[in-house]
Swiss-Prot record:
Keywords: Acetylation, Cytoplasm, Elongation factor, Endoplasmic reticulum, Hypusine, Membrane, Nucleus, Protein biosynthesis, RNA-binding. It comes from Oryctolagus cuniculus (Rabbit). The modification Hypusine is found at K50. It is a peripheral membrane protein. Belongs to the eIF-5A family. The modification N6-acetyllysine is found at K47, K121. The keyword Cytoplasm applies. PANTHER family: TRANSLATION INITIATION FACTOR 5A FAMILY MEMBER (PTHR11673). Binds to 80S ribosomes. Actively translating ribosomes show mutually exclusive binding of eIF5a (EIF5A or EIF5A2) and EEF2/eEF2. Interacts with DAPL1; interaction takes place at the polypeptide exit tunnel of hibernating ribosomes and prevents translation. Interacts with DHPS. Interacts with SDCBP. Interacts with DOHH. GO terms for biological process: positive regulation of translation; positive regulation of translational elongation; positive regulation of translational termination; translational elongation. This is Eukaryotic translation initiation factor 5A-1. Acetylated by PCAF/KAT2B, regulating its subcellular localization. Deacetylated by SIRT2.
Length: 154
């Protein structure tokens, strides 16, 4: 009976987000706005009116696309906060617009796209000149992107 069971594809069950009361959110923190993981860049609260609660006005920048999102919610309501992980990987190659990254476990991942714009150009330039660099990869809500580079410690 136990031979037919296959548990390899299960994940740890960790949620992509966790709830936090609107009034507990802070500037430079993270929040999900319009379904996107955002960094809070501006936050203001309005006073309690005759009817209802104090409102919190949030402005956030999408951590992957850089687009600006806004939302207003009562201060007592819960908002989703994305679980964000930052990992550094050693760059060992670039092929067809994808990065080859060496993980701590010794495995190589080749599923991460070379970022567009200045960061992508800088990564290519440093790789072509033979520099050993670490790529900082940000993951949140099933998305991942290379967001920064730094020289490897010798």
């Amino acid at each position: 009976m136990a031979d037919d069971l296959d548990f390899e594809t299960g994940d740890a069950g960790a949620s992509a987000t966790f709830p936090m009361q609107c009034s507990a959110l802070r500037k430079n923190g993270f929040v999900v706005l319009k379904g996107r993981p955002c960094k809070i860049v501006e936050m203001s609260t309005s006073k309690t009116g005759k009817h209802g609660h104090a409102k919190v006005h949030l402005v956030g920048i999408d951590i992957f696309t850089g687009k600006k999102y806004e939302d207003i919610c009562p201060s007592t309501h819960n908002m989703d906060v994305p679980n964000i992980k930052r990992n550094d990987f050693q760059l060992i190659g670039i092929q067809d617009g994808y990065l080859s990254l060496l993980q701590d476990s010794g495995e190589v991942r080749e599923d991460l796209r070379l970022p567009e714009g200045d960061l992508g150009k800088e990564i290519e330039q440093k790789y072509d000149s033979g520099e050993e660099i670490l790529i900082t990869v940000l993951s949140a809500m099933t998305e991942e992107a290379a967001v920064a580079i730094k020289a490897m410690a010798k």
